[in-house]
Amino acid sequence: LKIGTEGAYPPFNLIDSNGEVVGFDLDIAKALCEKMKVECSVVTSDWDGIIPALNAKKFDFLAASMSITEERLQAVDFTDPYYTNGLQFIAAKNSDFKIDAASLKGKVIGAQRATIAGNWLEDNYGKAIDIKLYDTNENAYLDLASGRLDGVLADKFVNWEWLKSEAGADYEFKGEPVFDNDKIGIALRK
């Protein structure tokens, strides 16, 4: 079986220094393959095209920390959730970043494209803030660190991983999670 994943979403799926795709999602997927007594390989795909690639049979299932949403359920089926997550903002430690419409007005906030974080920003703040969407969270973090963004909204575990890095040392979580019941499942073709 071919496991589809993004390979750019640490700590859940990433490419290590040996070029191997590793992370929590792959640990789960490989354990399932072992339990089913089948050989599995890993195929990476850009996030934007990962569901169309699954439906085009480029891989057999997705282990990619994918949120189970009504919109996605129209295109694919999901297993029961294997973990839950939430969305939380990060910004510079010394900033006065607050999470309310008045405080965020005029701020530039980054999120990964085609994710619940990007959707949440658009649904909750729309035109009140400048939303910048990225192909990967890593690109959003680069712009945050270079001063092109005031904050980033992403899964709290993914943000936490970046905050532990050298690049994230001057940043911190801001406020409480804004969405804290994100159910993550393995996606399958219908």
Residue ranges and their predicted role:
Residues 26, 30, 34, 39-103, ...:
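Acidic, polar ligand-binding/catalytic clefts
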Residues 10-15, 71:
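Short, solvent-exposed loop/turn elements at domain surfaces
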Residues 7, 83-91, 156, 160, ...:
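Periplasmic-binding protein-like
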Residues 37-39, 55-64, 108, 136, ...:
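Alpha-to-beta junction loops
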Residues 7-10, 21-34, 88-139, 156-158:
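Bilobed "Venus flytrap"/periplasmic-binding protein-like clamshell domains
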